[in-house]
Amino acid sequence: MFDNLTDRLSRTLRNISGRGRLTEDNVKDTLREVRMALLEADVALPVVREFINRVKEKAVGHEVNKSLTPGQEFVKIVRNELVAAMGEENQTLNLAAQPPAVVLMAGLQGAGKTTSVGKLGKFLREKHKKKVLVVSADVYRPAAIKQLETLAEQVGVDFFPSDVGQKPVDIVNAALKEAKLKFYDVLLVDTAGRLHVDEAMMDEIKQVHASINPVETLFVVDAMTGQDAANTAKAFNEALPLTGVVLTKVDGDARGGAALSIRHITGKPIKFLGVGEKTEALEPFHPDRIASRILGMGDVLSLIEDIESKVDRAQAEKLASKLKKGDGFDLNDFLEQLRQMKNMGGMASLMGKLPGMGQIPDNVKSQMDDKVLVRMEAIINSMTMKERAKPEIIKGSRKRRIAAGCGMQVQDVNRLLKQFDDMQRMMKKMKKGGMAKMMRSMKGMMPPGFPGR
């Protein structure tokens, strides 16, 4: 997420953060680099101009905090201004209205509206314990109604049936009546996608909006469209009273222009980020955390939240108990750890939330592919239960059979066993309580180029 911008800004700010004093010249040079990085990230020009002016105003002649060097103070100013550009703090959904709270989703075709409705339904059901009903008012695309029905079943929320022969206003009114009758907390309304902002379609969504009077009107927009996302959101906002934005496909956006432009151009907050195809891949938008990620400082708070919500506690306690008894760490445990990592969004997602990732060379980053986890899982699945429990018995002929069973090479099996040995040693150190030793050994296990290596 935002890799190109993170690389450029991390490199630029690393050059200035070691400076003993800031002069107008080196601030000017650094700001020129920052400006280029933002423009290359497709941030809207008015946003870039205001951002640079605000940083310059605060940096030149700024009194430095005694605990920071002038260079560090400059980085702090840049981070604070990034946060300000994106909206200061997380804006949650307004669900305080008398139930059912109606949330209307609008946006262009292909932005990911229907998927976002499913993700939001899951988020509200699991995180906020809400009883959710979803309905599709997209009568122009029969597949959209079926898609939402399938998604609703997957995420465990209720679906209100609709038909292409009905009028969108009639559909949403019937759904609202049902939601009131059956005491639903939230009604999520999926609307037809527009190819562009045309008058007939905008009139239709205005009528839908007027008939159900939603407490939240969210504009769903594809992050990969860059500053166009902000301009489209502005056009929609002129027709509809938007309350926020859902930025989708953020995991595929290496630039980040949309995230930095939307708040400034529309005046509306980004409320959620779509960070993948899975139904749980929806994150509340925290400007301070995203600013830290953009500057390569990581996002430890989100990482902790991921661990708390996505790691299977029963399995974690089972492993801890096993290690305490001295039963050892085997390949079944290793397989479980790989699955937990996949549940948390995969290797790239985890690494993106760790501090210092902006300093990693591109050739090392390219190896952080989630396909690696899939291959490792396939190799372990090709082993017998005896081999998983006693990895030391895996020698030449067994390695050849395992490799053939999963379509890999023997060197792939060797690589996995080496990684398992490293993990096993680390677990032994944890058992002995040598946390400091373990941290040092983790640094040793990292490829050259990682922070701290």
Swiss-Prot record:
Q: Pfam families recorded for this chain?
A: SRP54, SRP54_N, SRP_SPB
Keyword GTP-binding carried by entry: yes
**Reactions this protein catalyses:** GTP + H2O = GDP + phosphate + H(+)
Keyword annotations for this protein, in alphabetical order, are: Cytoplasm, GTP-binding, Hydrolase, Nucleotide-binding, Ribonucleoprotein, RNA-binding, Signal recognition particle
The protein's matches in Gene3D superfamilies, at most eight in alphabetical order, are given as: P-loop containing nucleotide triphosphate hydrolases, Signal recognition particle SRP54, nucleotide-binding domain, Signal recognition particle, SRP54 subunit, M-domain
Q: Which CDD domains match?
A: SRP_G
- Localisation: Cytoplasm
Q: Where does GTP bind?
A: 107-114, 190-194, 248-251
Regulation of protein activity: Conformation of the Ffh-FtsY complex and regulation of its GTPase activity are modulated by the 4.5S RNA. Formation of the FfH-FtsY complex leads to a mutual stimulation of both GTPases.
Consequence of gene loss (knockout) = Essential; deletion experiments lead to loss of inner membrane protein targeting. Also leads to reduced targeting of lipoproteins Lpp and BRP.
Q: What's the Enzyme Commission number for this chain?
A: 3.6.5.4
Q: How does it assemble?
A: Part of the signal recognition particle protein translocation system, which is composed of SRP and FtsY. SRP is a ribonucleoprotein composed of Ffh and a 4.5S RNA molecule. Metal ions are essential for the formation and stability of the SRP complex. Interacts with the ribosomes, via ribosomal protein L23. Interacts with FtsY.
Q: What does this protein do?
A: Involved in targeting and insertion of nascent membrane proteins into the cytoplasmic membrane. Binds to the hydrophobic signal sequence of the ribosome-nascent chain (RNC) as it emerges from the ribosomes. The SRP-RNC complex is then targeted to the cytoplasmic membrane where it interacts with the SRP receptor FtsY. Interaction with FtsY leads to the transfer of the RNC complex to the Sec translocase for insertion into the membrane, the hydrolysis of GTP by both Ffh and FtsY, and the dissociation of the SRP-FtsY complex into the individual components.
Cite the domain annotation text: Composed of three domains: the N-terminal N domain, which is responsible for interactions with the ribosome, the central G domain, which binds GTP, and the C-terminal M domain, which binds the RNA and the signal sequence of the RNC.
UniProt similarity note = Belongs to the GTP-binding SRP family. SRP54 subfamily.
Q: Which PANTHER family match?
A: SIGNAL RECOGNITION PARTICLE 54K PROTEIN SRP54, SIGNAL RECOGNITION PARTICLE SUBUNIT SRP54
Family annotation (NCBIfam families): ffh
The protein's name in its UniProt record = Signal recognition particle protein
UniProt organism field: Escherichia coli (strain K12)
Q: Which gene encodes it?
A: ffh
